[in-house]
Amino acid sequence: MSDIDQLNTSLLAEIAAADDETALEAVRVSALGKKGSVSELLKTLGAMTPEERQSKGAAINVLKNAVTEALTARKTTLRQAAIDARLQAETVDVSLPVRSSPAERGRIHPISQIVDEITAIFADMGFSIAEGPDIETDYYNFTALNFPEGHPAREMHDTFFFNPDENGERKVLRTHTSPVQVRTMEAQTPPIRIIIPGKTYRQDSDATHSPMFHQVEGLVVDKKANVANLRWVLEEFCKTFFEVDSVTMRFRPSFFPFTEPSFEVDIQCDRSGPIVKFGEGTDWMEILGCGMVHPNVLRYGGLDPDEYQGFAWGMGLDRIAMLKYGMPDLRDFFNADVRWMTHYGFRPLDMPTLFGGLSA
């Protein structure tokens, strides 16, 4: 073994044995410093004959590169080990209260607040939360919800379609949260009482519409579910959500493929001022759609419509947030403007409760 090979073996062993960055730096200086062993070898290149420089020079450069790479790798390893050790030693008591600070704290987004409010209301009525995928199959988004072939919602101008897969099937960004109804009926034996908050997607964008928006809908399936039950649930929800003693509701006949009969629901309000006031006035405001679950949807969910019946309703979370809290433009919900969030957002500890008030 040549002297260069022996030096290479020795230096690599010293680098591997360095147990901290201080020791590693000492090895670097002894090898690559001004008077280091590798540096001294490099100085001899000028005194060598061309033949010696061709053979020994290449070996010395290989040695220098090997030592440099080993030093870099070892330094990275030591730094990562130091970080891991510090993380294991550090602890944060997350139960400690936040220190008072003049700095502005973050706010809860109105949509998150609205979801918490609605969840609190329906949880008090015995409902649970159900969720499903944002990327849906044509079957769950349309077919199982009784959308016939040729329905406008199946067209490209209204729905975001993915490219067909190897089987020719096109998945979609769900246009409503209703597919979760069918998934729940397939997986759960009645009685069913669920609400389904989530994101939905349609090709629409203006002051009151967004390509991505939020919906919440509810589903009740039982042997005796009926329109009277549906009306009571919606009345109790509206009174509690808008924090009024009473509401006057109007059910108008409508059409949805997945319900029969179907209704649009208006509630009486006062629209004379900049903010809509519910529980008073002589105006009407449409807030949601509802109806009895269509027998075909029950069948797709694996239930016998001769034994079970159900009712469902749905509304736009963004829209009812705008109505309740006087927000003029839906697009502001997604602009991440700190000034808007400071004005319309909620403090983190202002959790909605039925006892303390939803928007306290």
UniProtKB/Swiss-Prot annotation:
Disulfide bonds: none annotated. Binds 2 magnesium ions per tetramer. Its main location: cytoplasm. It comes from the Bacteria. It catalyses: tRNA(Phe) + L-phenylalanine + ATP = L-phenylalanyl-tRNA(Phe) + AMP + diphosphate + H(+). Its EC number is 6.1.1.20. One of its GO terms (cellular component) is cytoplasm. Keywords: Aminoacyl-tRNA synthetase, ATP-binding, Cytoplasm, Ligase, Magnesium, Metal-binding, Nucleotide-binding, Protein biosynthesis. It is found in: Cytoplasm. One of its GO terms (molecular function) is phenylalanine-tRNA ligase activity. Mg(2+) binds at E260. Its cofactor is Mg(2+). GO terms for biological process: phenylalanyl-tRNA aminoacylation. Tetramer of two alpha and two beta subunits. Belongs to the class-II aminoacyl-tRNA synthetase family. Phe-tRNA synthetase alpha subunit type 1 subfamily. NCBIfam families: pheS. This is Phenylalanine--tRNA ligase alpha subunit. The lineage of its organism: Bacteria, Pseudomonadati, Pseudomonadota, Alphaproteobacteria, Hyphomicrobiales. The gene is pheS.
